[in-house]
C-alpha cells in the first residue's frame, strides 16, 4: 500500500503514502501549439523530447507522463519504443508511458535494462511506469491492453490501472453511479494484477470523464469533472491504496483566461482530495487533444501555489510565540520588515512565481508590459536552447541506437554538443524486423 515511484535520479523519487501529493503530466494529444507560429500542428517525437526536457526544469512538476502522440511515426511498435526513449532521454524524473502490444513492452524493457545497468538494477529501481487502459467500460476487460499489463507486471514495471469511462456514454450519467462503476473496474484490475504477481506495484487509476451532454464531447475543464475526480481520490483513500487521478484538462485551446480558471479549480480540488498523483496537471488543452509548451511553464507556477495551499499554515508553539510581536511593538521599530524572523521565513514559508507578475504598474510598463504567455514563451525558449540532459551516457545511447530504431538524431537531441561525437551510421535506424 505504500509505494515508491523511482526517478532516474534518487532526488526525484516519489513516495505514494499518506497524504503526499505529486503533480505530473500526461495525455495523448495529437496536436501541439507551435511556439513560434501560435498555430496547431501534429505533434512529433522531437516535440515529446522537448517537452520532457522542459518539464525536467520545472520545480513543481514532479513526474513526466508522455503528453503527446508521435504523429510522425506510422509504425505502432516504433512509436511506442521512441515514445519511451524520448521521454527517458529528456528527464531524470519518473516517466510514465503506454504500449499497444505486449511485444512493445518487451522492447522497452530491453532498453531500460541497458540504461539501468542490468535487469536486476532495473527491478530494484524501476523508473518508468505504464498507464494501462485494461478495461473497456462498461465492465469489460480489453484483451490487448490486458496482455500488455501482464508483460509489464512480469517485467517489474509499475502500472497505473486506468478506467476511463465517459459519463453519459460508457459510464452512467449520474456522477455517483459513474464513480461506482469506475471503482469496481479498477478494483477488478487490482485483482488481475495480483493474480499475475502478488504484491506487484499498481496504482488505483479511476478516471471517469465528463461529457457535455448537449454534444457528447468530453469536457475535461468542467466543474463536474473536478468533483468526480476528487471522488475517485477519496475512494482510493477509503481503500488505503496509492492513487492517481487526472485534473487540469482544460477545454480551452490556448493558455488564456478560460484555461487558467478551469485548471485552477480542477487541480486545486484534486490536490485537496487526497490523491497521491495528479496527472494531466500541466500543459494540456482542448480536452486532451492539444498541448502547448508555454503552458508547462505557466502551470508550474500554478502547481507551486496549489501545493502551498495544501501545506497550509504551520501552527506550533514556535509560530504562535509572542516574542517577535513583543520585539517589534514594545522595544522595536513598530514594523516587521527587518525582523530576523521575516528574513528567515522569506524562503521557507513563502513561494514566489517564476513567470507570474507581481510588479507595480510602472515597473510592468518599463519592462515591456508583457503578459504571462509572452514571459512563459521566452522562458521556454531559454530552457530548450540550453538544457540537454546527459544522464544516459553516450556509450549506452550508442548501443541503444545499434539495437533499436531510434527516430531522434543526436544532433536534434544536442548529444553531439561538447562530446566530440560523429553521427552514428545507424542514425535513421532500421525498422523492427518482422520477428524481432
Residue spans for each PLM region:
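Catalytic-core signal marking the mid-to-C-terminal active-site face
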Residues: 294-436
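Hydrophobic alpha-helical bundle architecture
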Residues: 229-338
Amino acid at each position: 500500500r505504500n509505494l515508491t515511484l523511482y526517478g532516474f535520479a534518487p532526488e526525484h523519487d516519489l513516495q505514494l503514502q499518506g497524504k503526499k501529493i505529486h503533480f505530473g503530466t500526461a495525455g495523448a494529444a495529437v496536436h501541439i501549439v507551435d511556439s513560434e507560429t501560435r498555430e496547431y500542428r501534429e505533434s512529433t517525437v522531437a516535440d515529446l523530447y522537448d517537452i520532457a526536457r522542459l518539464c525536467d526544469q520545472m520545480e513543481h512538476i514532479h513526474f513526466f507522463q508522455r503528453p503527446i502522440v508521435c504523429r510522425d511515426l506510422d509504425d505502432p511498435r516504433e512509436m511506442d519504443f521512441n515514445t519511451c526513449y524520448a521521454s527517458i532521454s529528456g528527464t531524470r524524473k519518473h516517466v510514465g508511458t503506454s504500449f499497444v502490444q505486449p511485444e512493445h513492452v518487451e522492447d522497452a524493457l530491453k532498453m531500460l535494462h541497458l540504461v539501468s545497468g542490468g535487469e536486476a538494477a532495473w527491478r530494484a529501481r524501476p523508473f518508468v511506469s505504464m498507464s494501462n487502459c485494461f478495461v473497456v467500460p462498461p465492465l469489460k476487460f480489453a484483451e490487448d491492453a490486458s496482455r500488455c499489463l501482464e508483460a509489464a507486471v512480469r517485467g517489474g514495471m509499475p502500472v497505473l490501472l486506468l478506467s476511463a469511462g465517459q459519463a453519459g456514454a460508457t459510464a452512467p450519467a449520474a456522477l455517483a453511479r459513474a464513480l461506482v462503476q469506475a471503482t469496481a473496474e479498477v478494483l477488478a484490475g487490482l485483482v488481475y494484477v495480483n493474480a499475475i504477481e502478488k504484491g506487484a506495484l499498481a496504482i488505483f487509476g479511476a478516471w471517469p470523464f465528463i461529457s457535455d451532454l448537449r454534444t457528447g464531447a468530453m469536457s475535461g475543464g468542467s466543474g463536474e469533472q473536478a468533483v468526480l475526480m476528487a471522488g475517485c481520490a477519496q475512494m482510493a483513500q477509503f481503500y488505503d491504496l496509492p492513487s492517481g487521478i487526472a485534473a487540469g484538462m482544460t477545454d480551452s485551446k490556448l493558455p488564456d483566461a478560460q484555461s487558467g480558471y478551469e485548471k485552477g479549480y480542477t487541480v486545486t480540488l484534486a490536490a485537496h482530495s487526497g490523491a497521491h498523483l495528479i496527472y494531466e496537471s500541466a500543459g494540456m488543452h482542448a480536452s486532451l487533444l492539444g498541448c502547448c509548451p508555454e503552458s508547462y511553464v505557466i502551470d508550474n507556477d500554478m502547481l507551486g501555489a496549489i501545493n502551498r495551499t495544501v501545506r497550509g499554515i504551520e501552527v506550533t508553539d514556535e509560530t504562535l510565540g509572542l516574542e517577535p510581536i513583543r520585539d517589534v511593538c514594545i522595544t522595536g521599530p513598530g514594523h516587521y520588515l527587518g525582523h530576523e524572523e521575516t528574513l528567515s521565513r522569506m524562503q521557507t514559508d513563502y513561494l514566489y512565481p517564476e513567470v507570474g507578475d507581481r510588479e507595480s504598474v510602472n515597473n510592468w510598463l518599463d519592462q515591456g508590459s508583457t503578459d504571462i504567455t509572452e514571459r512563459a514563451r521566452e522562458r521556454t525558449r531559454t530552457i530548450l536552447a540550453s538544457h540537454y540532459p546527459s544522464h544516459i551516457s553516450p556509450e549506452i545511447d550508442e548501443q541503444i541506437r545499434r539495437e533499436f530504431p531510434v527516430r531522434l538524431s543526436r544532433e536534434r537531441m544536442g548529444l553531439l554538443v561538447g562530446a566530440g561525437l560523429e553521427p552514428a551510421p545507424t542514425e535513421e535506424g532500421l525498422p523492427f524486423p518482422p520477428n524481432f
